[in-house]
Swiss-Prot record:
UniProt family annotation: Belongs to the universal ribosomal protein uL1 family.
Name of the protein in question: Large ribosomal subunit protein uL1
Pfam family, one: Ribosomal_L1
GO MF term list: rRNA binding; structural constituent of ribosome; tRNA binding
One GO term (biological process): regulation of translation
Keyword line: Repressor, Ribonucleoprotein, Ribosomal protein, RNA-binding, rRNA-binding, Translation regulation, tRNA-binding
Assembly, per entry: Part of the 50S ribosomal subunit.
PANTHER family xref list: 54S RIBOSOMAL PROTEIN L1, MITOCHONDRIAL, LARGE RIBOSOMAL SUBUNIT PROTEIN UL1M
Organism of origin: Xanthomonas oryzae pv. oryzae (strain MAFF 311018)
Record's GO cellular component terms: cytosolic large ribosomal subunit
Function: Binds directly to 23S rRNA. The L1 stalk is quite mobile in the ribosome, and is involved in E site tRNA release.
Alphabetized InterPro entries for the sequence: Ribosom_uL1_bac-type (IPR005878), Ribosomal_uL1 (IPR002143), Ribosomal_uL1-like (IPR023674), Ribosomal_uL1/biogenesis (IPR028364), Ribosomal_uL1_3-a/b-sand (IPR016095), Ribosomal_uL1_CS (IPR023673)
Amino acid sequence: MAQSKRVKAIAAAVAPGKAYAFEDAIKILKTATKAKFVESIDVAVRLGVDAKKSDQQVRGSTVLPAGTGKSVRVAVFAPAGAKADEALAAGAEAVGMDDLAEKMQAGDLSYDVVIATPDAMRVVGKLGTLLGPRGLMPNPKVGTVSANPGEAVKNAKSGQVRYRTDKAGIIHCTIGKASFDDEALKSNLQALLLDLVKAKPATSKGTYLQKVSVSSTMGPGVTVDQSSLSLK
């Protein structure tokens, strides 16, 4: 089905202004003709924050209990020794210091996540213009600067997603694949929303989780009725 027909099919099944129970929202997305690839199920969460204020920007990470359905390649900056061994044992594709930095500068950037131990940031700092624009720069707020690189690697590979409010105060994130069963997708969404609630800025006033909508890779969003979720 062409994308325009797909969008129309989903739009026709959605009543304007209506919020759907999570299971019904997912059913609408799944019953539309699938693309030739397994699509992701994405979520957009509008938060009650003023994203223009630095103290109301929300940024962090969540380990989705059912995973993301994606294979994740991880590079770790850690000095030779116990920390490097820990990262390798956890499944990191590459571990190093200056040698790893040189490989990246030479064009080896085939990684989805870059992790660093605190004492390795002196090396990583030199790669800011290379890693920053690609969203790969390690940051303690999302767990990618860690004194426990083995744990950080396991989190990245087991379904960790990172989020950050955009200019409109909206979080965009993947919660799995269309091939996941409804309960897996629901548990992932609930885990994300619970972490967002924990990250609520102290200066945020009024309703915090203002709107939650789900969509498939090539489809429009369907608003989710938050009362159909367990957020306690």
